[in-house]
Amino acid sequence: MNIYKKDFPIFQNTSIIFLDSAASTQKPRCVIQELVDFYSTSYANVHRGSCDLANTATQKYENARQKVANFIHAPVKQIIFTKGATESINLVASGFSRLLKTGDEVLISESEHHANFVPWQQACLLNGAIFKAVRISEDGQLDISDFKAKLSKKTKIVALTHVSNVLGVKNPIEELIELAHNVGAMVLIDGSQSIAHMPIDVQALNCDFFVFSGRNFARTVDCRDGILVHYFTVFFQQAVHGGGNGAD
């Protein structure tokens, strides 16, 4: 057994060969233990109480936000915890559904996960915006010429995967982001499959939204599994999402 697999309790059963990490990774012992320790010693609602436990839980929660920000080189205030990458995309699409007008265009690619396909399709249906998908070639590469042909001043948002969850193809997102910004379009990048395999610097990428899910790189699966990095605070005033208790 290699040194990495030794960190994962599930692989103590040496008959297991797990090839579905693109959907969700197994969890290392340190992550499992941290979760057990938190539930055993520190559990309380965050940002909602004044007792010692609540203060400790809130501090741990915000420490996690800072670690995420450091990991992807993002301003900590731009990090939003969500239920998953799917909810992150839906949150952005929900905001755009209130901004799009008849004749506006949304551009994605044919290689998108359904989570980055259906929300934009539905957002366009709500208000008569035009939904466009860039072709992929026979070897799975995004067709750059088709991207350029379908990109226009009418394009309001470009939503693309960084790395395909099916094909493993890495899109040239730096070039695509620049092309989109040149026509005034915002860009959302789905980094769910790239986050575990390459360094990510969202400020260098210069995208407007970057989403990923912790479960794709050995994080626990819980009610705050997703990460959304955003650079347009005003934009989110358009999105009504959730409810429940509030705080000033």
State each model region's role.
Residues 1-248:
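Pyridoxal 5′-phosphate
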